[in-house]
């Protein structure tokens, strides 16, 4: 779901992969509060947050002398990063993240959960951003250096800080993004691969993967049966729709041939080939997950520069860095007489470079605005007409068992 839920909301996919109604609800920007998918994601984030809070509470009781060097602070930093990661997911999906003055932020638990503290009010959006950034700043200042793609690090925390600033979206935030993104690109252990192909050919060993997840032998044994495994996710169950293919196809971008393919996936269909997400697909099912990769910093830079009113040439520069390494024709400033076309091009490059990896398409389409003031998402998904549609509903179970939880307002089409 981390890969494709938001692509459905963006109007880029068709077909079904989890249930007969869920994908249609995503497309309609209206998943009912009783739907099990909303609860499952909410619970997974809650488990991660509670695990981090339990560790943070326990480690404070351990004498500093029991740790070598700054290891205690590093462990705290790793836990605070993971808490921020989970709370950011809640913010992006269940809260009014676009409205700093909204009271509809997520549930920001900061201590271990017990029966006595189960009832808790949700935080406001402004407070939520402050708390998430506090955790990320701690991880930047005290976290460990890069160890592997499965672990938190200073540079990873700064990468997520860049995304959080874009989401919060004040003019001051946008002004900071280009330089902060450049620091992630140049000051840490990550490195852009020389080619788009190498990002995926090198898998977990790619210098560009900033954060992924580890699959145990038990999980790998189940990849051909698990509907949520990356290996099985596409496989004829869902596929790019016409709008996606207008933006990204074999004619207009060399990355397409490295992104999609058709193979004989016998566990799914032993007779006919099926469409797969080639860039992530692995025969053994150990498909890398890209919660964030370094190329996003270039895309974040382009988005922020456009917002800041930079020249067309300056906006195109980070996009062309990615086009150059993939063997595509470079974009030229003189071809853009309309600022709206520049906004659309940034979005198209996000789809071509990062499509179906981590929901980057949706959040960019929500953030970016046309000269009319309308969100770009209004062109991509005609169902959108009101910002209340941008947030999922709080799951019914949370509202039932947490008596202080206030649900999100429901959009009602007149």
Predicted regions and their residues:
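Hydrophobic-face positions in mid-chain alpha helices that act as interaction patches
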Residues: 174-294, 329-330, 343-345, 353, ...
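Conserved, well-structured interaction surfaces
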Residues: 19-94, 123, 140-147, 283-294, ...
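Alpha-helix C-terminal capping/termination sites
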Residues: 89, 167-171, 300, 307-309, ...
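Short coil/linker segments at helix-helix boundaries
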Residues: 70, 93-130
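Short, surface-exposed recognition loops and adjoining beta-strand edges that mediate ligand/DNA contacts
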Residues: 3-10, 14, 95-107, 145-224, ...
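Short alpha-helical hairpin
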Residues: 9-32, 264-276
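Active/binding-pocket-proximal capping segment
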Residues: 298, 314-328
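Inward-facing hydrophobic residues that define packing positions of alpha-helical scaffold repeats
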Residues: 52, 129, 136, 174, ...
């Amino acid at each position: 779901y981390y890969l494709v839920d938001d692509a459905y909301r963006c109007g880029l996919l068709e077909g079904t992969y989890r249930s007969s109604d869920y994908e249609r609800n995503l497309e309609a920007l209206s998943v009912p509060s009783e739907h099990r998918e909303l609860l499952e994601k909410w619970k997974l984030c809650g488990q991660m947050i509670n695990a981090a809070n339990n560790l943070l509470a326990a480690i404070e009781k351990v004498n500093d002398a029991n740790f070598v060097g700054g290891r205690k602070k590093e462990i705290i930093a790793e836990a605070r990063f993971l808490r921020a990661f989970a709370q950011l997911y809640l913010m992006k999906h269940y809260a009014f993240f676009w409205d700093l003055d909204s009271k509809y932020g997520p549930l920001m638990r900061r201590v271990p959960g017990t029966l006595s503290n189960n009832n808790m009010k949700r935080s406001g959006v402004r407070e939520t951003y402050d708390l998430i950034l506090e955790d990320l700043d701690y991880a930047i200042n005290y976290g460990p250096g890069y160890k592997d793609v499965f672990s938190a690090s200073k540079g990873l925390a700064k990468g997520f800080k860049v995304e959080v600033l874009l989401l919060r979206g004040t003019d001051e935030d946008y002004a900071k993004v280009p330089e902060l993104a450049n620091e992630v690109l140049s000051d840490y252990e990550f490195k852009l691969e020389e080619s788009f192909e190498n990002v995926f050919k090198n898998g977990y060993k790619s210098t560009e993967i900033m954060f992924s997840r580890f699959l145990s032998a038990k999980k790998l044994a189940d990849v051909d049966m698990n509907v949520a495994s990356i290996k099985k996710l596409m496989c004829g169950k869902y596929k790019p729709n016409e709008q996606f293919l207008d933006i990204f196809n074999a004619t207009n971008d060399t990355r397409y041939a490295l992104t999609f393919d058709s193979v004989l996936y016998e566990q799914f269909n032993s007779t006919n080939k099926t469409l797969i997400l080639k860039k992530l697909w692995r025969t053994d099912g150990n498909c890398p997950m890209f919660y964030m990769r370094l190329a996003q910093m270039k895309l974040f830079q382009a988005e922020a520069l456009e917002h800041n009113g930079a020249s067309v040439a300056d906006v195109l520069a980070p996009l062309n860095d990615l086009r150059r390494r993939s063997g595509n024709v470079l974009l030229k400033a003189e071809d853009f007489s309309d600022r709206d076309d520049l906004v659309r091009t940034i979005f198209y490059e996000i789809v071509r470079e990062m499509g179906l990896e981590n929901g980057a398409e949706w959040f960019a389409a929500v953030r970016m605005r046309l000269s009319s003031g309308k969100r770009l998402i209004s062109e991509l998904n005609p169902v959108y007409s009101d910002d209340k549609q941008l947030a999922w509903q709080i799951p019914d179970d949370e509202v039932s068992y947490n008596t202080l939880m206030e649900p999100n307002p429901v959009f009602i089409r007149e």
